[in-house]
Every structure is written in C-alpha cells, then in structure tokens.
Regions:
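Flexible gly/pro-rich beta->alpha loop and the following alpha-helix that scaffold active-site loops
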Residues: 20-87
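Pocket-forming structural segment of enzyme catalytic cores
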Residues: 100-186
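Short N-terminal binding/cap micro-motifs at the start of the first secondary-structure element
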Residues: 12-17
Length: 252
C-alpha cells in the first residue's frame, strides 16, 4: 500500500492539524502542490486515500489562475468510481460536487466566515464517519461560494439554515465538507490578514481570529476522531459492515 494522495490547492491551506491526526492514525501521506507546478497524478494505483484541500481558487466556472482544477476533478471521478476513500474540504468539496455534475455558485447568502455550528441530517445516523459526530458539531467557515445542487445520488449529512449543503457523501467512500476542520491559529491569522472579505463585512481581523481560536479545542474534540476513522477506512481497518454499499457511479 502506498501513501494517501493530498492535493494542496493553495499554500495557505495545508493539512495542518488534520495532517497531525492522520499521522497519529499511521496513514502515510504524499502532498501534491499543483500551484507550485507539481503535476496532478493521473494514476491512483496503490493509493489508500485521496484528500483534496481548500484555498482561494474557485470552482465557479474555469479559474485561469488554477488551470489544474479540471485534472483534480478527473482524479476525484476516478477515486469515487474505484471506491478509494476520499475527503474534500472547502474547495475540495466543491470540486467533488462539480466533478459529478453538482453545481457550485457564488453564495446568495453572502460570505460565511468564522466559527459556526452545522446540524446533522437523518442520513448521518448510518454513515460510517458521521454517525459518531455530535448533532451540532463546531466547525470553521471561510467561503464565498457554495454547493447549490448536490450530485445525483449524493447523501446530505449536515446542513445549516443559510447554506444547506454543509457535508455530503458520494458513493460509499467519498465525503465533502463545506467547512474547515484543519485550521490552527496561524492558518486563520494568515487568511484574515488583508482579507478583502473581512473588510467588506466590516469585521476586524483580530476579532475573527480570536473567535476562531476559541473553538479550536471543540473542533479537535469532534474532528480528530473523524479523521482517525477516515484513516482507519483508508487502511482497511473498518469492517465492511460499517460501510453501506451503494450503486457504482459512472466515471473513468
């Protein structure tokens, strides 16, 4: 078994705490940085998992500054088709959706920034990862785009009032999270520094950072076990009875 493939789409959004949790679970990782001219691998042979992170590029139409995104979409289609455990966060969740004919648009509700709660949906009760997540887990939000239509066959796992598609599963081994679980203080501080979104919202950067830092402990309490369970799935340590089978999705 090789290393889990991590696609890092932005130097300001790396694995950070998520990487620490996966290391604790003994999941080896290899990071691909397309923004630094790393080629997006076309082959997923021997990959136990695929993780696609967030960042400034947008999945709303072609992004000329991120010409690698179509290749990432193709990789996600292949991962889902071949039942490789997959996790998309932020932009990664958007790409998981658009790769399978979902829709991502600029959010009509406006930007969502800072700590928030999301609500689990009924389907989460039988999900191999979300079944252990609290009913209203703490998360961090930092986005202006949102998934407005899930791919056909996707299972909604978490929602909020103004942003209804907060988490979903596609097939039986691929998850998309609109929100962020990987952040630490330094990452949030970097995002806040000079943020035009915060300026538009008239939110002081230090206030937003402090609010995010206050919930980091709660986020770790919920999402560290989630990450460890994802790693266990990737390493083949979860019994098949924990994983609901679905019909295969079309893809290459």
């Amino acid at each position: 078994m090789g290393s889990a493939l991590v696609i890092e789409n932005d130097p300001t959004d790396d694995l950070r705490r998520l990487g620490e949790w996966l290391a604790e679970a003994n999941l080896p990782i290899e990071v691909c940085r397309p923004y630094a001219d790393d080629p997006v691998p076309a082959d997923l042979a021997d990959r136990p998992a695929v993780i696609v992170l967030g960042g400034r590029p947008s999945a709303v139409g072609p992004d000329p500054a991120a010409g690698w995104l179509p290749a990432v979409e193709g990789l996600l289609r292949k991962a889902v088709r071949h039942r490789i455990p997959t996790l998309g966060i932020g932009l990664g969740a958007h790409l998981l959706a658009t790769a399978h004919a979902g829709t991502v648009e600029r959010s009509a509700a406006g930007p969502e920034i800072g700590p928030a709660l999301v609500g689990k949906r009924d389907a989460a009760a039988t999900d191999p990862l979300f079944r252990y997540v609290p009913l209203a887990p703490d998360v961090l939000q930092w986005h202006v785009d949102e998934i407005t239509e899930l791919p056909h066959g996707a299972v909604l796992l978490a929602a909020s009032t103004h942003y209804p598609h907060q988490a979903f599963r596609l097939g039986d081994r691929a998850w998309g999270l609109q929100f962020h679980i990987e952040c630490d203080r330094d990452m949030v501080s970097t995002w806040a520094a000079g943020s035009t979104i915060l300026t538009e919202l008239r939110l002081p950067a230090d206030v937003v950072v402090d609010a995010c830092v206050e919930v980091l402990g709660d986020i770790e309490e919920v999402w560290q076990p989630f990450a460890v369970r994802f790693a266990a799935l990737a390493l083949g340590q979860l019994p098949d009875s924990d994983i609901p089978r679905t019909l295969p999705l079309l893809g290459s």
